[in-house]
UniProtKB/Swiss-Prot annotation:
InterPro entries referenced in this protein's UniProt entry, alphabetically: Ribosomal_uL22 (IPR001063), Ribosomal_uL22_bac/chlpt-type (IPR005727), Ribosomal_uL22_bac/org-type (IPR047867), Ribosomal_uL22_CS (IPR018260), Ribosomal_uL22_sf (IPR036394)
SUPFAM superfamilies: Ribosomal protein L22
Gene Ontology MF annotations: rRNA binding; structural constituent of ribosome
One Pfam family per UniProt: Ribosomal_L22
This protein's name: Large ribosomal subunit protein uL22
Origin species: Limosilactobacillus reuteri (strain DSM 20016)
């Protein structure tokens, strides 16, 4: 009972960029073909685009090597970012006080499916 696997997934955890900023990039590539998604990411002027590109590249490699899927027929079926743990830091302020700084992290997941 060998099931036909038509999708592959890749996840990057603890990426030092907020999930809110990553979602803006992921919304641009969701539903697109892999070639089109790489072209969009290459010209997206956002810092998170390089992190998303790495995850997409990994998902495509997983599809090709682990499941023997054809790269030309792959589509970004799912792309989402969840919040990771927040690193809490403090910025010194006037009169001996301090203000909190939240350095947010995210978990980026990309799923590619054969069309």
């Amino acid at each position: 009972m060998a099931e036909n696997i038509t999708s592959a997934k890749a996840t990057a955890k603890m990426v030092r960029v907020s999930a809110r900023k990553v979602r803006l990039v992921l919304d641009a590539i969701r539903g697109k073909s892999v070639a089109e998604a790489f072209a969009i990411l290459k010209f997206t002027p956002r810092g998170a685009a390089s992190d998303v590109e790495k995850v997409l590249k990994s998902a495509v490699a997983n599809a090709e090597n682990n499941f023997d899927l054809d790269r030309a027929s792959l589509v970004v079926s799912e792309a989402f970012a969840n919040e990771g743990p927040t690193l809490k830091r403090f910025r010194p302020r006037a009169k001996g006080s301090a203000s909190p700084i939240n350095k947010r992290t995210s978990h980026i997941t990309v799923v590619v499916t054969e069309r």
